[in-house]
Curated annotation (Swiss-Prot):
Biological process according to GO: translation
Keywords tagged on the record: Ribonucleoprotein, Ribosomal protein, RNA-binding, rRNA-binding
Family membership noted in the UniProt record: Belongs to the bacterial ribosomal protein bS20 family.
UniProt protein name: Small ribosomal subunit protein bS20
Biased composition (Basic residues): 1-11
InterPro entries in UniProt: Ribosomal_bS20 (IPR002583), Ribosomal_bS20_sf (IPR036510)
One annotated GO molecular function: rRNA binding
Keyword field contains Magnesium: no
Cellular component GO terms held in the UniProt record: ribonucleoprotein complex; ribosome
């Protein structure tokens, strides 16, 4: 940690930012885990709201700079493809 007041302030700010990013990352991973569990169990009714929740969390994390924008787009695409593959229905889900 720095000696000057500004260095201490920057350190404190980076700690707060790191914790916020950690919480957002953890929330997104938890959502993904719940969604994957619902899809693998074949529960169609609960997996669609979980997918929407996951997409919302990922977009928020990307907007805040926790995840890279294209990495989030790739993850969302894979999750939607998984849903459409498992529950192959005439309606295609795009989020």
């Amino acid at each position: 940690m720095g000696r000057s007041v500004s260095a201490r302030k920057r350190h404190d700010q980076s700690e707060v930012r790191r914790m916020r990013g950690r919480m957002a990352r953890s929330a997104a991973r938890t959502c993904a885990r719940r969604y994957l569990a619902a899809v693998t169990s074949g529960d169609r009714e609960s997996s669609l709201p979980l997918l929407r929740s996951l997409v919302k969390r990922l977009d928020t994390a990307a907007r805040k700079g926790v995840f890279a924008r294209k990495a989030v787009a790739r993850q969302k695409s894979r999750m939607c493809r998984l849903y459409n593959g498992v529950f192959s229905s005439p309606e295609v889900v795009r989020v």
